[in-house]
Swiss-Prot record:
Sequence similarity: Belongs to the class-V pyridoxal-phosphate-dependent aminotransferase family.
The encoding gene: Scly
Modified residues annotated as N6-(pyridoxal phosphate)lysine in this record: K247
Protein name: Selenocysteine lyase
Region (Disordered): 1-20
Compartments, record wording: Cytoplasm, Cytosol
Organism lineage string: Eukaryota, Metazoa, Chordata, Craniata, Vertebrata
Keyword vocabulary terms for this entry: Acetylation, Cytoplasm, Lyase, Phosphoprotein, Pyridoxal phosphate, Transferase
Organism in which the protein naturally occurs: Rattus norvegicus (Rat)
Pfam families attached to this UniProt entry: Aminotran_5
Length: 432
């Protein structure tokens, strides 16, 4: 891993056709060791993991090893890891399972939907926040549209960008079945208070149990946090945790951690078929990608502190250079006082009526980045709803650019892209 940190200040010209990638929150390249693990599995473990011959047994061993690697990365147990196609499936699986569990509990108590009065509430209630990924927000909105569930979208603080624990607790109803809050926001990098939410919900569940009310489960989407900071399910206290491989230099598959899967915590399949993953997620396992995911998890377990320290150093240097170059015109949208954030994320705006974020990036010759979440790239001319939710003024949010550095980003590359941004601004409005 290249962790070079030296870079000269001053005027730096980028070689022709040189590109500097700073969109690591959108996706990451595969580490060489991950590519090797994927390739070896393709060559040597091509058999069906459910088969008894050598290639099949080797595939099964690779899957079991990867499961253990993921568990180690998050401080959980291997039997609590379910492989999925990615974060979207994992998040949908949590929501689907919670709805099913709610209705089964109602049936067991002899309270079918048509027996319960509207006042008592017949639909499961979810609590989430206003800055969640679309793979949480859209499934929940779909359930509301179909009158299958009720959802409270708790706003984040306009002071610190975090969801407030007390606001989560105040939203709990007798029919609440799930609180789902991301661990770290993909646009601002703000770390959410998941441990405190879990602790308070656990205490509340003891009171609810005495009244015969359903247990409130806690889920966090850890896509942005993994590989950038230590993530431990025991510290977080969650029932579900979403894992996304391509955010930590792994392949584009994922996994779901479920505490005591099927016993302590309910999980219901969305698909039915061959019975793989203990019937929770059937379908012949994608052995090569699982091998790569396991190797990526190993690298995180071994090097997380090194990765974190390097990214923080580079990100801080980036913000210093931006402030030095653009002075009072720069607005650091992801820097909230007293709030922890991801070590690699810098969301900023250069103030000026001609400096919309997408316009600035279009003029850049070297920088590869985005204005916000890549899944919203078709709405790049609109201010980010996440930034607006965090209290960023509309005129500032319109100009936002999200830079996210990676494991091998250097100070020299930072110097290049700051100069690139400067020339882009000059192109749009003349010299600063």
């Amino acid at each position: 891993m290249d962790v070079a940190r030296n870079g000269a200040r001053g005027s730096v010209e980028s070689p022709p056709n040189r590109k500097v990638y700073m969109d690591y929150n959108a996706t990451t390249p595969l580490e060489p060791e991950v590519i090797q693990a994927v390739t070896e599995a393709m060559k040597e473990a091509w058999g069906n993991p459910s088969s008894s011959y050598v290639a099949g047994r080797k595939a099964k061993d690779i899957i079991n090893t990867a499961r253990a690697s993921l568990a180690k990365m998050i401080g959980g147990k291997p039997q609590d890891i379910i492989f999925t196609s990615g974060g979207t499936e994992s998040n949908n699986l949590v929501i689907h399972s919670t709805v099913r569990c709610f209705h089964e509990q109602q049936t067991l108590q002899g309270r079918t939907v048509d027996q319960i009065s509207p006042e008592e509430g017949t639909r499961p209630h979810f609590i989430t926040c206003t800055v969640e990924h679309d793979s949480i927000r859209l499934p929940l909105e779909h359930l509301v549209e179909d009158q299958v569930a009720e959802v409270t979208f708790v706003p984040v603080s306009k002071v610190n960008g975090q969801v407030e624990v007390e606001d989560i607790l105040a939203a709990v109803r007798p029919t609440t079945c799930l609180v789902t809050i991301m661990l770290a926001n993909n646009e601002t990098g703000v770390i959410m208070p998941i441990s405190e939410i879990s602790r308070r919900i656990k205490a509340l569940n003891q009171i609810r149990a005495a009244s015969g009310l359903p247990r409130v489960l806690v889920h966090t989407d850890a896509a942005q946090a993994l590989g950038k900071r230590r993530v431990d399910v025991e510290d977080l206290g969650v029932d579900f945790l979403t894992i996304v491989g391509h955010k930590f230099y792994g392949p584009r598959i994922g996994a779901l951690y479920v505490r005591g899967v099927g016993k302590l915590t309910p999980l219901y399949p969305m698909l039915f078929g061959g019975g793989q993953e203990r019937n929770f997620r059937p379908g012949t396992e994608n052995t090569p990608m699982i091998a790569g995911l396991g190797k990526a998890a190993d690298l995180v377990s071994e090097n997380c502190e090194t990765y974190e320290a390097h990214m923080r150093d580079i990100r801080d240097y980036l913000e210093e250079r931006l402030e030095a170059e653009f002075g009072k015109r720069i607005h650091l949208n992801s820097r909230f006082p007293g709030v922890e954030r991801l070590p690699n994320t810098c969301n900023f705006s250069i103030q000026g009526s001609q400096l919309r974020g997408y316009m600035v990036l279009a003029q850049c010759q070297t920088l590869l980045a985005s204005v916000g979440a890549s899944c919203h790239s078709d709405h790049e001319d609109r201010p980010s709803p996440v930034l607006l939710s965090c209290g960023i003024p509309v005129d500032v949010a319109r100009n936002a650019v999200r830079l996210s550095v990676g494991r091998s980003t250097t100070r020299a590359e930072v110097d290049l892209i700051v100069q690139d941004l400067k020339q882009a601004v000059n192109q749009l409005e003349g010299p600063v």
